[in-house]
Amino acid sequence: MLDNKFGFKQRVASLRWLSAAIMLSVSAVPAWAFSIDDVAQQAEKLAQKGFEAPKSNLPAQFRDMKFADYQQIRFNNDKSYWNNVQTPFKLQFYHQGMYFDTPVKINEVTATTVDEIKYAPEFFDFGPVNHDPESVKNLGFAGFKVLYPINKADKNDEIVSMLGASYFRVVGKGQIYGLSARGLAIDTALPSGEEFPRFREFWIERPKPNDKHLVIYALLDSPRAAGAYRFTVYPGRDSVVDVQAKVFLRDKVGKLGIAPLTSMYLFGPNQPSPTLNYRPALNDSNGLSIHAGNGEWIWRPLNNPKHLSVSTYAVENPKGFGLLQRGRDFTSYEDLDDRYDLRPSGWIEPKGEWGKGKVELVEIPTADETNDNIVAFWTPDVLPETGKPLDVKYRLHFTRDEDQLHSPNIAYVQQTRRSAGDVKQSNLIRQPDGTIAYIVDFIGPNLKELDENAPVASQVSIGDNGEIVENNVRYNPVTHGWRLTLRVRVKDAKQPTEMRAALVNGETTLTETWSNQLPANE
């Protein structure tokens, strides 16, 4: 009996301990948590039914306004969302106007709830914009922005903007907005025309008091695709966004652009302005950088062509690619108003193996800097089946530290300059000879370590539309690197001319690959 009583008491004690442990476990893990799977369920359901085009609810007065008028509509700072919440992040919202004519739904996610953030005209100062107050009562938000004390502890600056289609922009400390990222690109540069998916709904997690990151979910929709996105934003000297996406195709597409970047290139040293301009360069980005799966680094200077141009680089399991702004000296741009020297580079760092595919660069003619005419993305060789999810993860860096965006073991292209080719005559006067000259400066720690008399040579190739008439490599005592000079004779000016070059020392490759295109009709 004593043994039985003791055994019974022991079992009771064990059950009490187990019950307490279960209670502690339940209380330690939230009973409910919002995740990308919740958004993915909606995306999958959307993809299983026909696309419903969003309907504009915007009065003509707002739809027809000019950009300068739209800028007059400002969010009231004292209405910033989370003003009364202990968090360094604040939210503000964009009003509908111009081509931002369709409202997007924006929700706040807490530990226990999901609540829509309702539009109210009182959020906005309409300034000199004359309007009927009744006409804006039932409108909505066009998008939102995130504020954070990134530059000064006592001042909130804008660090994220999500406005229009699936576009978003992010900046780090000391940066200003430049290039944009997108959620997805469909049929870019195809004759059938491009399809622009849009984020139709957002869910933003309310940060905890000590959180230094912000989580944003988005539901993407378009005639042939739907998708779920999770963005985790880490503001800092270089702001970083971890992106997770689950994309479902409604119908077949010709081309699917993953991790698209959009930028602007008007002119620069490799393609000087056709009209006299005090600015040496005017661009948000000046080159495409690729770190291929086989380890090769490629640098492709950007162009503003006279005709649509598409360049393709076969890359299996890319290690990274991006649109960069190399050259951070103010004297490279000389623009006090638009400060192109402060605009960030965008670098995509894939997570996991993406498989076989291509990095594609699209260059579109533009007459001025108001048009984003550069697009870069990765496109898979095998598209997902309709209704089957395409899962992709990557990290997006917004940085001005381009020195970190290339291998420390090889040199990189500091600058590319283009001019008319010439030959020095016996009287020392340079005479143009109908060729195109390229000056390419390579710099890097490995070149600095070489003696200036080292046997550095070039490996150069050119397409069928051109021939190399000069190929010269010399030490540059100013940069402690090496300068490559090429003179190219073009056979048919109506066709583009492709060329590639790298520097070597014997069997050792010293530099990244310079991959250049001379556009047609230059």
From Swiss-Prot:
GO cellular component: outer membrane-bounded periplasmic space
Keyword annotations: Periplasm, Signal
Subcellular location field: Periplasm
GO biological process, one term: beta-glucan biosynthetic process
Signal peptide from the UniProt entry: 1-33
Pathway membership: Glycan metabolism; osmoregulated periplasmic glucan (OPG) biosynthesis
Pfam family, one: MdoG
Main localisation: periplasm
GO molecular function term, any single one: catalytic activity
HAMAP family for this protein: MdoG_OpgG
Family from the record: Belongs to the OpgD/OpgG family.
Function: Involved in the biosynthesis of osmoregulated periplasmic glucans (OPGs).
Name recorded for this polypeptide: Glucans biosynthesis protein G
Source species: Pectobacterium atrosepticum (strain SCRI 1043 / ATCC BAA-672)
Underlying gene: mdoG
